[in-house]
């Protein structure tokens, strides 16, 4: 078995991906497959934390144009991320692997509050840690949350799961001449305006010296492949 490239990572998953081929909600077969991928990756000897978006349930930035204030809408979206974490936690635990959801919001009847100490302890106990509630503050995306939490818990990289196998010069689904980058610096990613992550996330990763690996989650086993150094993606670092 190949030695993993990283030993502690944050995996960023899109909430929209949880909907599968539906336009809304939770597609259980998709979540079950992701749970299996995360477990297989953990079995490589990697400590795994996960940040999930909430766009399959609610998008605060969209309702802010319909009479709901942006802070309120963002809070609703952050609560949706906790729902996704609980769904993934259940799918992981059905497979006999321990997982824990930690939230940026105090909700003791639902899950524990995120603290660095709690996250460190659960990761050391070989539990998959699911980080819900975003940053706990409006106006910040879950991409930024992933980088922030990675820096807080001492992760060595952020694995950004998307529906394409890296960062391209243009949308490869619209432009067949788009070129995939093997590697970019954080500044190049910012200057290029690539939409795979928001500028705040890239800037924070640059300031905290955190590599971001952008890859496609569509293929089963892709998380483990990235961790073992055999996967296809774009490394954003330096």
UniProtKB/Swiss-Prot annotation:
Reactions the enzyme catalyzes: UMP + ATP = UDP + ADP
InterPro entries: AceGlu_kinase-like_sf (IPR036393), Asp/Glu/Uridylate_kinase (IPR001048), Uridylate_kinase (IPR011817), Uridylate_kinase_bac (IPR015963)
Transferase as UniProt keyword: yes
GO MF annotations in UniProt: ATP binding; UMP kinase activity
Superkingdom: Bacteria
GO cellular component, one term: cytosol
Biological processes, Gene Ontology terms: 'de novo' CTP biosynthetic process; UDP biosynthetic process
Enzyme Commission code(s) on record: 2.7.4.22
Binding of ATP, residues: 12-15, 55, 59, 162-163, 168, 171
Subcellular location(s) per record: Cytoplasm
Listed pathway(s): Pyrimidine metabolism; CTP biosynthesis via de novo pathway; UDP from UMP (UMPK route): step 1/1
Broad EC category: transferase
Binding site for UMP: 54, 74, 135-142
Keywords: ATP-binding, Cytoplasm, Kinase, Nucleotide-binding, Pyrimidine biosynthesis, Transferase
Activity control note: Inhibited by UTP.
Database matches in NCBIfam families: pyrH_bact
Known role: Catalyzes the reversible phosphorylation of UMP to UDP.
Family: Belongs to the UMP kinase family.
Quaternary structure (record): Homohexamer.
Descriptive protein name: Uridylate kinase
Gene source species: Rhodopseudomonas palustris (strain BisA53)
């Amino acid at each position: 078995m190949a030695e993993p490239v990283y030993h502690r990572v944050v995996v960023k998953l899109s909430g929209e991906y949880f909907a599968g081929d539906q336009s809304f909600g939770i597609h259980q077969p998709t979540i079950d497959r992701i749970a299996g991928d995360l477990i297989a990756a953990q079995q490589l000897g990697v400590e795994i934390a996960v940040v999930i978006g909430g766009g399959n349930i609610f998008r605060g930035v969209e309702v802010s144009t319909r009479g709901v204030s942006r802070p309120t809408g963002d809070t609703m979206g952050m609560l949706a991320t906790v729902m996704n974490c609980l769904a993934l936690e259940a799918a992981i635990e059905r497979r006999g692997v321990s997982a824990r959801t930690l939230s940026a919001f105090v909700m003791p009847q639902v899950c524990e509050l995120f603290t660095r100490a709690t996250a460190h302890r659960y990761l050391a106990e070989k539990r998959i840690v699911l980080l819900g509630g975003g940053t706990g503050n409006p106006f910040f995306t879950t991409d930024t949350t992933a980088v922030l939490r990675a820096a807080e818990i001492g992760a060595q990289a952020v694995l950004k799961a998307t529906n394409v196998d890296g960062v391209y010069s243009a949308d490869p689904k619209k432009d067949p001449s788009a070129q995939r980058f093997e590697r970019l610096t954080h500044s190049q990613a910012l200057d290029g305006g690539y939409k795979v992550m928001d500028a705040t996330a890239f800037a924070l990763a640059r300031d905290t010296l955190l590599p971001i690996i952008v890859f496609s989650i569509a293929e089963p086993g892709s998380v483990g492949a990235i961790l073992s150094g055999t996967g296809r993606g774009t490394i954003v670092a330096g």
